[in-house]
């Protein structure tokens, strides 16, 4: 059990005394004492140990135990059962075992005796790790009202959101996911485990686990271990491991309901959960089952005044345009804007700031989500030394997102390689065009831009179904050795339906119409025979329902991920040293990951306006063997109260020719010169093989918010970038037609990602060095300081859109370079596409310092009731950078100090509890940042004294949670509530055009909800 979980149990515990009478048996034996009520656990221990326990009922009533499953001596088992109760085992002068109260029991020592899956190791009796472990237990998750594990974990410094409901509205494949990233190194470098086991990826575009598919109701605690973990768990554990440890010993029935709302309206939520468990067949069989359903309602842009502020920032000139409207209007804009339609009819001289279309009104800030989860578990004791077990987790997550209606123009391209364009309308044959527009058009035809609102807003429906299951056998051998054999199967099926998109081939046919014998018809005979309906785009509401039905395309995309694993290991003591037993583990793992996708034929042929998602299939297989060892070198020696060395090695063989065989390893040391101080260090080599999408996927569309480096460029703007922008004839023509300045019309750009079959593994060398201090003179206090350095060579990544744009246009030799080959502009110079292909870049490096401290105390001497705990978690980023080969030299992308990668982050907490109440105040701090480091460099180069929206102040968010239990010693009923973001701080104002902002003027790092409330009730019976 982590220190956080232990402290919670301490706060809920009471003083008690227990006397053990009789003779304790000296030899080790097998124990299986269930978690739950302490009295029941002590009775079970008494039966299994063959000893008599004497205790006062009132002293143990309401206390709980974590349970023990082990082959151990009774004294050790009893000590484990009492972990977290402020009781410890002592032998009196007569030789009998006794239980005495220790007011200042060290947190981690109490935590170290729990029989759990130890994150970061498979060794039996190794509880202190050489790398930092931060945990969040069930009580904290419950009382803070979190329904999403990712949202809860991002309160921990160093844990960042990767994808969330607040930042994936425009994403093609990630919409509605909920993933995290350790050290900002990416969700695919954070290995997520469930009870120490790998689990199938349920993200559409990378190897990542969406935490929304794991029901928080069934989670006992979550442990986050930083540092390379590939030697223990295999590929992907580059930045660290998130181990989600599920409920193991639910006795009886537990039910919960939680409701949430926001102070400014919208974004409500509700959760219903129920679970039941019990023992049968003379306690040989344990069964548990449960289900949870939660709904996150939509938070629309219209629910927040800030989201509707229509502002466009132009970074090239450090100016603001307001209102920030789209030139793709609902009535159509024709002949380069010389004519347009509004509600009153045909008008001359379109001005975007006056006549444009406001896209924000249909926007979504929080994607609505329905989440149904189920879980079943069983354990069956086949013999006294062998147990069969199994568990399955099912998740069905649906999300629905709404976006503004699709736009179409004469330069809109379609086809697999964008080889076709919709094209101009005939100025002589089109039967709907008025005389004014026909007369103004050139001989090449009528150019146009039109938002097709009559078809309806874009609707994106995602359904993600995930099944995870494991079955296994485990048992004990002679000489205190244990073994475990597990088979796991996981399957993810995702389907996306994109409604109200356009069939661009049909749009082309329908626009190419004529009047014959007084009847308007499509000119293409084959299209006409297939039911072509001529399309009238001239005017607001000019598209009839029949026209809309003909060009509408509701498309689908389906993906299936499957994972099968077989793993086994044995663990136990190799031999004894004077300081203790040398513990070891030996094991194997065989894994197969398979991905296949199926795409709507209209998407495959490229005629649908929805993002292009290709069909592909790929399989990765890996066979691995591993070993771990921990050796206590010294104990109770001068300047060596404890000295332990540990190490691990894993050899993996892949079916990928570019990867082959990899070797991961780690070596660590823990040294306590005195009992109060523990120094820990570990050096590890970790690998991550490319996943199926990174290897096999053809280019697949995605939509990113991209600020064009050419936006705002004028004839006099200095610098190489501006010079290269003006050299593009399309941009120059657009400048001439727009008053001498080039303006980006939309920052929503297609940014397709492509795999690369030549990728090979990335390799990380990680160092952690730190210390833990628990002074005996200050009971209840603990502090730790850790330094980390992660260096990833041959890092698998694609360059950012900003890096590709800058690499293209900052070349003094012009735009004939590899970066410009990834960039596509339309006939008017507008940025429409940037291709991102995965490649092995030079290096990514992350360095920093983590500080943690907690102090548990009471103020009884001042007659203040209750117990207190103060805590601090602080993270200081020293470096986060990526190197890649530029035009003529190695370029470096620095990220520290920008939005999302602040130099300083911290979380402060103060808890108070008594026999009935628990109150928790927490504060999250994000240090001052800049919108982007590229913008800061530009501002310095331009000499701007006051660059807009660049320098952003510190951010604080304060939360409070309160819970009430009528009888804490028998906590069958609990009422709890939270207020998050008490002071309703939305963070910095970041409009469209800033690198980290968007058209709704926020960044999800700071949240988009504002003040939020939850109220819940939990009962057990």
Labelled PLM ranges:
Residues 645, 782-935:
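Gram-negative outer-membrane beta-barrel transporters
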Residues 97-100, 125, 154-198:
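Extracytoplasmic beta-strand/coil segments of soluble accessory domains associated
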Residues 299, 305-312, 339-369, 375, ...:
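Surface-exposed, low-complexity loop segments enriched in small/polar and acidic residues
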Residues 97-102, 149-152, 178-181, 210-212, ...:
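N-terminal periplasmic accessory domains that precede
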Residues 249-253, 265, 281-284, 383-386, ...:
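Short loop/turn motifs that connect adjacent beta-strands in outer-membrane beta-barrel proteins
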Residues 197-226:
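Short acidic/polar hinge/loop motifs at secondary-structure boundaries
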Residues 42-44, 48, 94, 100-142, ...:
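Short, acidic, small-residue-rich periplasmic hinge/interaction motif at the N-terminus
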Residues 791-793, 878-881, 923-937, 964-1021:
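C-terminal beta-signal and adjacent terminal beta-strands/loops
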């Amino acid at each position: 059990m982590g220190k956080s979980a232990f402290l919670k149990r301490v706060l809920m515990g009471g003083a008690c005394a227990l006397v053990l009478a009789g003779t304790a048996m000296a030899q080790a034996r097998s124990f299986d004492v269930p978690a739950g009520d302490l009295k029941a656990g002590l009775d079970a221990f008494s039966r299994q140990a063959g000893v008599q326990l004497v205790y006062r009922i009132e002293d143990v009533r309401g206390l709980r135990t974590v349970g023990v499953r082990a082959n151990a001596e009774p004294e050790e088992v009893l000590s484990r059962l009492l972990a977290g109760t402020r009781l410890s085992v002592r032998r009196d002068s007569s030789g009998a075992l006794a239980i005495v109260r220790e007011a200042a029991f060290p947190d981690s020592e109490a935590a170290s005796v729990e029989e759990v899956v130890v994150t970061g190791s498979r060794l039996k009796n190794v509880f202190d790790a050489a790398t930092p472990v931060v945990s969040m237990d069930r009580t904290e998750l419950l009382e803070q009202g979190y329904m999403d594990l990712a949202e809860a974990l991002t309160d921990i410094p160093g844990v960042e959101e990767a994808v969330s409901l607040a930042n994936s509205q425009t994403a093609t494949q990630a919409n509605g996911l909920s993933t995290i990233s350790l050290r900002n190194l990416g969700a695919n470098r954070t290995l997520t485990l469930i009870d120490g086991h790998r689990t199938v990826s349920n993200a559409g575009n990378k190897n990542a686990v969406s935490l929304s598919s794991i029901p928080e109701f069934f989670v006992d605690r979550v442990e986050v271990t930083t540092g390379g973990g590939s030697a223990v768990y295999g590929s992907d554990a580059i930045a660290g491991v998130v181990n989600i440890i599920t409920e193991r010993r639910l006795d009886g029935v537990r039910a919960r309901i939680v409701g949430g709302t926001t102070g400014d309206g919208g974004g409500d939520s509700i959760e219903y959960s129920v679970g039941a468990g019990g023992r049968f067949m003379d306690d040989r069989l344990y069964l548990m089952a449960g289900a949870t359903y939660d709904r996150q309602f939509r938070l629309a842009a219209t629910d927040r005044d800030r989201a509707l502020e229509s502002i466009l920032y132009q970074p090239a000139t450090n100016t603001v345009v307001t209102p920030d409207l789209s030139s793709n209007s609902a009535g159509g804009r024709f002949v380069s804007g010389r004519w347009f339609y509004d509600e009153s009819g045909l008008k001359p001289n379109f001005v975007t700031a006056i006549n444009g279309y406001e896209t924000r009104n249909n926007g979504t800030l929080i994607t609505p989500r329905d989440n149904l989860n189920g879980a079943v578990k069983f354990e069956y004791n086949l013999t006294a030394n062998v147990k069969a077990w199994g568990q399955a987790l099912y998740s069905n997550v649906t999300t629905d997102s709404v976006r503004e209606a699709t736009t179409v123009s004469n330069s809109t391209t379609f086809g697999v390689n964008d080889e076709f364009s919709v094209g101009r309308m005939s100025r002589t044959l089109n039967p709907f065009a008025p005389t004014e527009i026909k007369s103004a058009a050139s001989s090449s035809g009528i150019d146009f831009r039109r938002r097709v609102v009559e078809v309806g807003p874009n609707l994106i429906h995602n359904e993600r179904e995930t099944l995870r299951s494991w079955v296994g056998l485990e048992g004990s051998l002679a000489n205190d050795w244990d073994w475990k054999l597990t088979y796991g199967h996981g399957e993810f099926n995702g389907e996306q339906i994109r409604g109200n998109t356009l069939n661009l081939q049909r749009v082309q046919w329908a626009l190419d119409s004529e009047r014959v014998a007084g009847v308007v018809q499509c000119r293409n005979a084959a299209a006409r025979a297939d039911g072509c309906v001529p399309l009238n785009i001239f005017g607001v509401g000019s598209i009839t329902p029949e026209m809309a039905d003909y060009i509408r395309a509701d498309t689908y995309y389906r993906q299936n991920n499957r994972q099968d694993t077989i793993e086994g290991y044995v663990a136990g003591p190799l031999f004894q040293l004077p300081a203790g037993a040398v513990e070891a583990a030996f094991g194997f793992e065989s894994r197969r990951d398979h991905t296949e996708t199926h795409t709507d034929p209209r998407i495959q042929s490229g005629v649908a306006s929805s993002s292009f998602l290709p069909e592909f299939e790929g399989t990765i297989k890996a066979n691995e063997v591993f070993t771990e060892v921990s050796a206590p070198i010294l104990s109770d020696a001068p300047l060596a109260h404890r000295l332990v060395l540990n190490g691990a090695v894993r050899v993996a063989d892949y079916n990928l020719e570019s990867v082959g065989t990899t070797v991961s390893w780690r070596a660590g040391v823990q040294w306590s010169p005195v009992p109060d101080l523990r120094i820990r260090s570990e050096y590890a080599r970790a690998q991550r093989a490319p996943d199926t999408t990174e290897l096999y996927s053809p280019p697949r569309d995605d939509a990113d918010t991209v600020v064009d480096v050419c936006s705002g460029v004028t004839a006099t703007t200095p610098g190489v970038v501006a010079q290269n922008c003006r050299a593009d004839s399309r941009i120059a023509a657009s400048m001439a037609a727009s008053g001498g300045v080039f303006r980006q019309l939309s920052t929503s750009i297609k940014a397709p990602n492509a795999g690369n079959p030549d990728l090979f593994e990335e390799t990380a060398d990680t160092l952690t060095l730190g210390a833990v201090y628990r002074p005996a003179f200050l009971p209840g206090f603990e502090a730790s300081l850790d330094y980390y350095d992660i260096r990833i060579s041959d890092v698998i990544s694609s360059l950012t859109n900003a890096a590709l744009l800058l690499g293209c246009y900052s070349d003094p030799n012009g735009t004939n370079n590899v970066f410009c080959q990834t960039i596509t502009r339309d006939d008017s110079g507008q940025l429409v596409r940037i291709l991102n292909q995965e490649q092995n870049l030079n290096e990514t490096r992350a360095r920093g310092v983590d500080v943690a401290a907690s102090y548990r105390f009471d103020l009884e001497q001042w007659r203040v009731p209750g117990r207190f705990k103060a805590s601090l978690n602080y993270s200081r980023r020293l470096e986060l950078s990526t190197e890649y080969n530029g035009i003529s030299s190695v370029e470096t992308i620095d990220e520290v100090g920008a939005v999302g990668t602040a130099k300083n982050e911290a979380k402060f907490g103060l808890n108070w509890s008594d026999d009935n109440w628990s109150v928790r105040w927490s504060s999250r701090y994000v240090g001052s940042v800049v919108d982007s480091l590229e913008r800061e460099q530009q501002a310095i180069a331009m000499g701007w004294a006051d660059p807009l929206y660049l320098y952003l102040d510190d951010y604080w968010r304060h939360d409070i949670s309160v819970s009430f239990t009528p009888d804490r010693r028998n906590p069958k009923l609990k009422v709890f509530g939270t207020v998050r973001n008490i002071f309703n701080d939305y963070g910095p104002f970041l409009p469209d055009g800033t690198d980290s902002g968007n058209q709704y003027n926020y960044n999800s790092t700071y949240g988009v909800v504002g003040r939020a409330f939850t109220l819940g009730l939990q009962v057990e019976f």
